[in-house]
């Protein structure tokens, strides 16, 4: 693989007036000198549809261990994002790092503030600095990340940093009406579209209220111009958090915004519990899908449909599943309300299992799609591939037998969400390291030595490298191809 060194000159600091206050700081270091553009993975699962699929690579033949970064200043839950030969990663200590894609050396780091480490009504992540996956604006050459910052009243901030220097170009406080930081958490991945960064919020682990005040699901749209007013969507009822690690999905054809919610509290009489919700680019005009049995089997037992983010297969077809273990194909342009799915058939509804019959804590995070399969992790049941018919929307359920053309691999392992690249499905597990399975039939292609990961961690891939957050370091693995075939780009 040829690596070309390109000098990036220093960028002039730009003063932006923003509604909630902008902090412009000095460059933390001299401008970086990255390797030439070598693949990109600018958002959670690569694209706005969250396919998690890089279709541009030849078939992998073998894999070797590459660089491991120096220890970072905190744990990494967020997926790395990659652009222009640089791997960007963010920690629970509110620091963003830029690492050279070729060797893992630190090109710059930017500490955004002191993270909040106490004061929540409930929760299971401490501190909560940067938890959700950032997103890169490849045109404006910025990375956006949301950090919880300690203070007399702790606040969530959206930061926009210059890709080359880490200079802060945008800093906006996120405090929509009715928002209570003690019971709200930003875990889901950010999305960039329509001139906004979309930021999802849900409850903290434990589903706590602040007295009688509930948490809600929020999506905040922050204008990237730094001047226009923020926009907000809030779910109709208490609970209904937008907390899955995959976060917000955007349909690039309609520009509509989609996300999935957890259970309402209480369940009865609510309208957005365990739902897929579509809103306009300005977060208005919501339409919904809810399972026919949303109250009895999803809401009441806390079996959130929104434990994972949906994946767009096409503008008119999306797959979603959640903790109760049922999967659905829906039409994002016509979600259809309760029992409005395309598959399984609304007539005489019967759940289509996706995790070998599991009906509790079945799947989390997000999915990947590479025709004809949707790939998902199943808690304690390994990796599952579901064969999808896109012409007559349906898929082969993975019931306890998980019969062909579906496949299941990885035994009883609990993986993080999968991605697809070079004809392989890549997943990581805590203590087990990185695994790669043949995309067509689940044959094991590669197994690394064991290492630890945090909850819901998903890899990234760019330049024929698979990039995995491993607690306080980033680990990378290089793909090799048949003789005479090199990495594209």
Indicate where each model-derived feature is located.
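Short, solvent-exposed beta-strand-terminating loops
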Residues: 42-46, 110
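Extracytoplasmic/lumenal domain signature
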Residues: 26, 34-37, 53-74, 82-88, ...
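Solvent-exposed adhesion/ligand-recognition segments of exported proteins
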Residues: 38-39, 47-51
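C-terminal motif of bacterial Sec signal peptides marking the signal peptidase cleavage site
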Residues: 16-19
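Bacterial signal peptide processing site
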Residues: 21-23
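Bacterial N-terminal signal peptides that target proteins for export
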Residues: 1-8
């Amino acid at each position: 693989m040829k690596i070309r060194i390109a000098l990036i000159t220093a960028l002039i600091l730009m003063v932006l007036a923003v509604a909630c206050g902008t902090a412009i700081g000095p460059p933390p270091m001299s401008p970086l000198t990255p390797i030439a553009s070598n693949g990109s993975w600018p958002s959670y699962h690569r694209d706005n549809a969250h396919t998690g699929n890089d279709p541009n690579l030849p078939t992998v033949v073998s894999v070797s261990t590459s660089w491991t970064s120096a220890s970072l200043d905190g744990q990494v839950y967020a997926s790395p994002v990659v652009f222009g030969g640089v791997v960007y990663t963010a920690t629970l200590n509110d620091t963003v790092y830029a690492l050279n894609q070729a060797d893992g050396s630190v090109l710059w780091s930017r500490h955004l503030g002191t993270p909040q480490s106490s004061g929540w009504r409930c929760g299971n992540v401490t501190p909560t600095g940067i938890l959700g996956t950032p997103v890169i604006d490849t045109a404006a050459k910025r990375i956006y990340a949301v950090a919880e910052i300690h203070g007399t009243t702790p606040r969530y901030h959206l930061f926009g940093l210059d890709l080359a220097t880490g200079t802060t170009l945008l800093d906006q406080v996120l405090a929509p009406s009715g928002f209570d930081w003690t019971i709200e958490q930003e875990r889901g991945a950010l999305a960039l579209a329509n001139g906004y960064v979309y930021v999802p919020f849900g409850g903290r682990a434990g589903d706590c209220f602040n007295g009688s005040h509930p948490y809600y699901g929020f999506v905040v749209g922050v204008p990237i111009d730094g001047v226009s007013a923020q926009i907000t969507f809030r779910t109709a009822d208490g609970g209904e958090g937008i907390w899955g690690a995959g976060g917000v999905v955007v349909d690039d054809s309609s520009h509509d915004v989609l996300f999935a919610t957890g259970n309402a509290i209480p369940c009865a009489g609510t309208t957005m519990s365990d739902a897929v919700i579509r809103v306009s680019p300005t977060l208005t005009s919501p339409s919904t899908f809810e399972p026919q049995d949303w109250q009895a089997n999803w809401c009441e037992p806390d079996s959130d449909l929104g434990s994972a983010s949906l994946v767009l297969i096409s503008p008119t077809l999306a797959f979603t599943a959640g903790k109760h273990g049922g999967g659905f194909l829906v039409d994002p342009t016509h979600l259809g309300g309760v029992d409005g799915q395309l598959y399984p058939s609304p007539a005489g509804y019967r759940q289509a299992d996706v995790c070998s019959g599991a009906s509790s804590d079945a799947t989390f995070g997000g999915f990947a799609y590479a025709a004809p399969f949707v790939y998902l992790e199943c808690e304690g049941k390994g990796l599952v591939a579901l064969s999808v018919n896109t012409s007559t929307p349906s898929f082969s359920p993975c019931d306890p037998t998980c019969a062909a053309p579906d496949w299941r691999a990885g035994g009883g392992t609990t993986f993080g969400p999968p991605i697809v690249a070079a004809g392989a499905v890549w997943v990581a597990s805590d203590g087990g390291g990185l695994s790669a399975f043949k995309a067509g039939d689940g044959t094991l292609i590669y197994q690394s030595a064991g290492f630890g990961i945090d909850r819901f961690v998903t890899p990234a891939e760019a330049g024929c490298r698979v990039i995995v957050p491993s607690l306080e370091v980033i680990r990378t693995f290089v793909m090799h191809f048949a003789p005479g075939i090199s990495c594209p780009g």
